[in-house]
């Protein structure tokens, strides 16, 4: 298989814009941009590229088609693509493409205008044997680290990332809202936030768990639930997290 030098990009969301711009800066030629609104993704240069809305109109002579759409749309888009080019998608949880191709999953939240995006970011690679050499070279153009994972390893890593990043960020968002409602300055909690992140980086989160849940301090738990009466949608989260902490540590202690 030839090196990936000319591509078509499907999608115009954050992944399309950030990864597309990164590859364009590395000299990759974009022959077509395809999305429902038939617009040029922000941050990319058109040059001589076609701008289309129908995936079936993508030129069949490109080296690869980059499918950077939502997970729910990937399989439907792939059904409409020309059969010849290599197909690459960026989902952490979907299967590898059936036809020759693979997955390049960025192990990082993709955010526009983030300085960290310009310094490269870790990427997980899973692909067919025939595409391995070309996709490895292509990924290394923008990756700070490249990790080869099987399909099930990548899907498990994506699940872990949701807990480590998405859910953690949501918990911080809840904490920040509670502080705002009580007129508490968020900088009070910056030291403990940094401590938690350091423990996570060290891989010692479980061993260093603290708080009323692990102590089974029911009076503190009840007091917290009482404070959540004004935001009842947070109560199931608090209760589920409390039970999860207790269950995880009880399972470890059971001989």
Segments from the language model and where they lie:
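Short amphipathic alpha-helix with an adjacent loop that forms part of the alpha/beta core around
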Residues: 55-61, 79
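Active-site regions of enzymes building and remodeling cell-envelope glycoconjugates
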Residues: 45-53, 84-88, 98-107, 140-146
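Internal alpha-helical scaffold of NAD(P)-dependent oxidoreductase catalytic cores
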Residues: 29, 115-201, 243-244, 249
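Short, charged/polar "capping" segments at the starts of alpha-helices
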Residues: 38-43, 95-98, 131-133
